[in-house]
A protein has these predicted regions:
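N-terminal signal-anchor/first transmembrane alpha helix
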Residues: 1-65, 95, 99, 126, ...
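Transmembrane alpha-helix boundary and packing residues in multipass membrane permease domains
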Residues: 27, 31, 74, 125, ...
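Hydrophobic alpha-helical transmembrane segments of membrane transport/permease proteins
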Residues: 22-73, 162-202
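Membrane-water interface at transmembrane helix exits
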Residues: 30, 34, 38, 42, ...
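Hydrophobic alpha-helical transmembrane segments
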Residues: 48-63, 154-167, 212-217, 254-271
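An internal, D/E-rich "acidic patch" concept
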Residues: 1-8, 43, 65-121
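Hydrophobic alpha-helical segments embedded in or immediately adjacent to the lipid bilayer
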Residues: 122-123, 135-187
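Alpha-helical transmembrane segments of integral membrane proteins
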Residues: 6-10, 102-135, 151, 182-342
Length: 342
C-alpha cells in the first residue's frame, strides 16, 4: 500500500469516526423536536374525530404509549433498519413515500446542481480573470442579485413569464397526464424510466416539465458559485505558479483553467458541495411552487396534517443526506489536495 493511499485511508477512518457522534446528535434533535410539538399528533393527524378507545389503539400501534426512552430506542432501531413506520394520514409506509417521491427530488436537485455549476463556474472564472472590468462588475451584480431573490418568488416570475405570458413551458407537475400514464415506474425518475422503456418520444415532454423548476433552483445556487469561484480564482492568479506558467508562454486561458482554477479547487468544491446539501431545503419551496411531486411537497403535506411519523422519517433522511454529502466533500477535497489529509 502506497503512502498516498494509506494517508487517504487514515483520513477516511478519522472522518467516519467524527460522523458517528454527529449523526447521533442529529437523530436526537429530530426525535426531541417531534416530541415537543404541541397537542396529540395521533389525534391531530386523524382529524380529532376518534373516540378515546380508538385513540388508545392508534397510540399503541404507533408506539406513543411507551416511555420516551423506549420510543427513542425504537426510533434509532428504525433508522438502522430503514423502516420508519407508517404514515397516519394515508397509511403508507414512510419508506415507500421516500422511494417514490425521493426519486423526483433527486431528479430535480441533480438537474439544478448541473445548472448551478454550469453557469456559476464559467462566469466566476471569467470574472476572476477580468478583474475590475465591466464583465466582473456584471458577474458580481448577478451573483448578489440572483442569490437575494427567494426561490419561490423567482419560480413565480418564471411561471408568469414562460408559462402564462409566452406560453412556452408547462408550469406544474412532472409530466403531462398522458405521458405519466404511459411510463412504468422502474426508478420513479421519469426521464430514466422513459429511456428504460424506450419511450424516447416522451422525453421532450419530461424535459419541458423539468426545465422551469430546475433552472429556478439552479440559478439561485449559481449566485453563490459565481462569487466563490471569482474570489478564489482572483487569489490564485496572484500565485507564483501563475507567473511561471505565463513565463513559459502558455495561453492565458490555459493559465486560468489548468493553474489558477486547479489551485482554487478545494474551497470551491467545499462550498459548492455544501450548496448541494442546501438544495434539499430549496427543493421544498421549489416543489411546492411548481407542484413537483417530490419529497419536499410530501413534507409540506404531512406537516399541514401534523403527521409527525411521516415528518420524522423524512427529516431524518434529509439530515442523513446532508451528513453524507459533507463526508463526500471531505473525501473529494482530500483526493484533490493531499495537504488536507494531514
Amino acid at each position: 500500500m502506497t503512502s498516498t493511499s494509506g494517508s487517504l485511508r487514515r483520513y477516511l477512518l478519522t472522518r467516519l469516526a467524527l460522523v458517528v457522534p454527529m449523526v447521533l446528535i442529529l437523530l436526537t434533535l429530530v426525535f426531541v423536536l417531534m416530541r415537543v410539538a404541541p397537542g396529540n399528533p395521533i389525534e391531530a393527524a386523524l382529524g380529532g374525530h376518534l373516540t378515546h378507545a380508538q385513540l388508545v389503539v392508534r397510540e399503541r400501534a404507533a408506539g406513543y404509549d411507551r416511555p420516551l426512552i423506549v420510543q427513542y430506542g425504537q426510533y434509532l432501531g428504525q433508522v438502522l433498519t430503514g423502516h420508519f413506520g407508517t404514515t397516519l394520514t394515508d397509511q403508507r409506509p414512510v419508506t415507500q413515500v421516500l422511494a417514490q417521491n425521493g426519486a423526483a427530488t433527486l431528479e430535480l436537485t441533480m438537474s439544478a446542481m448541473v445548472i448551478a455549476v454550469g453557469v456559476g463556474i464559467p462566469l466566476g472564472m471569467l470574472a476572476g480573470r477580468l478583474r475590475d472590468t465591466l464583465v466582473d462588475a456584471l458577474a458580481r451584480l448577478y451573483g448578489i442579485f440572483i442569490y437575494a431573490i427567494p426561490v419561490f418568488f423567482l419560480g413565480l416570475l418564471a411561471q408568469l413569464l414562460f408559462g402564462h405570458i409566452l406560453n412556452w413551458l408547462p408550469t406544474s407537475s412532472q409530466a403531462s397526464v398522458i405521458v405519466q400514464a404511459e411510463l412504468q415506474p422502474h426508478t420513479n425518475i421519469l426521464i430514466l424510466d422513459a429511456m428504460i422503456d424506450g419511450q424516447w418520444g416522451d422525453i421532450p415532454d419530461l424535459l419541458a416539465h423539468l426545465l422551469l423548476p430546475a433552472v429556478t433552483l439552479g440559478l439561485v445556487i449559481s449566485g453563490v458559485v459565481v462569487r466563490l469561484v471569482r474570489v478564489n480564482v482572483m487569489q490564485a492568479m496572484k500565485g507564483d505558479y501563475v507567473e511561471a506558467a505565463r513565463a513559459r508562454g502558455l495561453r492565458e486561458r490555459t493559465v486560468v483553467v489548468r493553474h489558477a482554477f486547479k489551485n482554487a479547487l478545494v474551497p470551491i468544491v467545499t462550498v459548492t458541495g455544501l450548496q448541494a446539501a442546501l438544495l434539499l431545503s430549496g427543493a421544498v419551496l421549489t416543489e411546492e411552487t411548481f407542484n413537483w411531486p417530490g419529497i419536499g411537497n410530501e413534507l409540506i403535506y404531512y406537516l399541514e396534517n401534523r403527521d409527525y411519523i411521516a415528518v420524522q422519517g423524512i427529516i431524518t433522511v434529509f439530515a442523513l443526506a446532508v451528513v453524507a454529502i459533507s463526508l463526500l466533500i471531505d473525501l473529494i477535497n482530500a483526493w484533490v489536495d493531499p495537504r488536507v489529509r494531514y
